[in-house]
Amino acid sequence: MAVDKFPIEAGHIMMFARSIGDANPIYYDEDYAKGTEPGGVVAPPTFVQASAQFDPDYFLRPKIGQEWFGSAKGPTGITPKEGGGSGGGSGGGLHAEQHYVYHKPLVAGDTLTATVKPGKSWEKE
């Protein structure tokens, strides 16, 4: 996660829910959400990963005046290393797993605090 603390805003929740195609009114309708157990607009479970998109220093965010290194730069989205050939080591990494522990719903107005812990790593044989 790119930021240590991230305030959760109702507008960000609504835009995120729209972007994933989830029209559940608990993600945008304050009047509807007041009648639910959480008592307010809540964020979809995967919203926590979206906080990086609002951090101007996030390392994967495009930077003005700097060449883009990410997807669509090449046919696969991976720019080959010079002299890298086609074998192992010239490809990109694979994000295999994430784990989240939720203690309560994330409600608009909350502040999200992230803790990053290294997980297991492995290589394909």
Residue ranges and their predicted role:
Residues 1-95:
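Hot-dog-fold acyl-thioester-processing enzymes
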Residues 96-125:
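Hydrophobic beta-sheet segments that form the core/acyl-binding groove
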